[in-house]
Every structure is written in structure tokens, then in C-alpha cells.
Amino acid sequence: MKKLFAILFVLSSVISVKAAKVDTVSTYSASMKKNIKAVVITPDVVNSPEKLPVLYLLHGYSGNQSDWISKVKTVADYADQYKMIIVCPDGNFSSWYFDSPVDKSWKYETYVSNELPAWIDSHYKTINTASGRAITGLSMGGHGALYLAFKHQDIFGAAGSMSGGVDLRPFPLNWELSKRLGSYAEFPERWDNNSVINLTHLLTAKSLPLIIDCGSEDFFYQVNVKLHNKLLETNIPHDFISRKGAHNWEYWSNAIGYQVLFFSRFFKAN
């Protein structure tokens, strides 16, 4: 009899465990005239009438919408734990999340900062204001998250970066940046204007809660330290995390937990 009760207890515990729902959806970009996939992770709050905050989670160079959910299994757990929707859009192989001045068909700033949030808000029960939206990402996506949040503070209320390429100029021959911006030698002003480190003038002390994380062995470490120091010099509050680690999924699998906790606190405060 005791064994039976034990089995029933275990079964009831398993059944009662909540599980986030992971869907791959097809969104539409009017500016690029094409469908774009996104992974949407919704917490198990089906019967709840409350609207939910949304975290936009961006992938890096050469990645796609499935990177985060396939390589970091805890991402879905975070949606349940913190009762938030997590959206991982396809930012293409090398969009860098801006509207390219070279190829007008690449409008990923417009897509992620405008078209995608509008689509998500129309299909899910969301808090459809900046106080209910945050954005972060890794590498190219870390650049993209800060870049978009700095420029679109009416859309995103908080932002983060993990191993972000926050200054593009030291890397003129890398990651197809010249295809998106033109060569650095010919168009230095484009590289200046699209580097996160040059957009801090858009911030005030109260504009955006920020969390920036980069490993000390990362090739983006020095540009992240420079951004951190610039934010300190201009009295912009932010969390800056640095620990031993490189530009890899081992580092990001750990970093994402700090990011989600940071945004959960932001959502609760608002």
C-alpha cells in the first residue's frame, strides 16, 4: 500500500509539473515582403487572464531562430519560472539587426523593432508597451539588442547583451559586416553610426535598465569594457558582468540565467 501511494504521489507530481509551450511561427515583414520564422515560448498559464511580458532573444552571426531553444534547454524553463513569453526571431545569417544602407531589402531593424512586436502583440496576450518588453541576445544579437533598444526606447523598456559586438569598427573584414554597411575604408561614417558604443548619447540615467555580460577571453571583451567605461563616464546605470569565459555556448548557457532574472525584476517593478 505504501508503495502504491508513493507511485501515485510521483505520478501526480509529474502531471502537475508545468511545461512551457514551444512553437515555431511564421511572421510577416511588410518592409522586406517576406515571411520570417520565429520561435515563441509561452509559459503554462493557459487559464490565466493576465497579460504577459515579452523577452526578445536574438541569435548570433550565422545562427537562426532555433539556436537558443536547441542549444540551451533551460530557456523554455525560464519562460515558466518567470511567467514571460520568450521570442527568438530569425535575424538572418548576417543582418546585424539594422536596416542595411547597402542592400535595401535587408530591413531587420524595422522588422525586430516594429513589425515583429506588432505581430506578437496581435497573436498573444501581451503587455503591449515598453514596460512589458525587453530585448537581449548573443554576439551579433548582443549588438542588435542594445542597438535596437537604444534607438527604440518607445518599444523596448530594458535591454541586455551577451558577448555583444558593441563596436563594429575594429572588425572591418569580419562576419559580412561590409556586405551590410559597405567597406569601412569607403564608408567610415556608416560604421560609426551603427556601432552601439557611439549611440550612448541616446540614453539618460533613467531611460533603459541595462545588463551587459562578456567573458574575459572573448574577442569582443575589450569593446565591451570600453562601452562599460563610457557608460560609467556618462553616469548611465547598468549591470556589467565579466568572468572567465570565451565566445561560446558554454558561456552563454550560463549568462542567459542572469539576463532573464534581470528582466524579470524589471517586469515586476513595472
What is the predicted function of each stretch?
Residues L4-V14:
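Sec-dependent N-terminal signal peptides
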Residues A19-N270:
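Non-catalytic cap/lid and distal C-terminal segments of serine-dependent acyl enzymes
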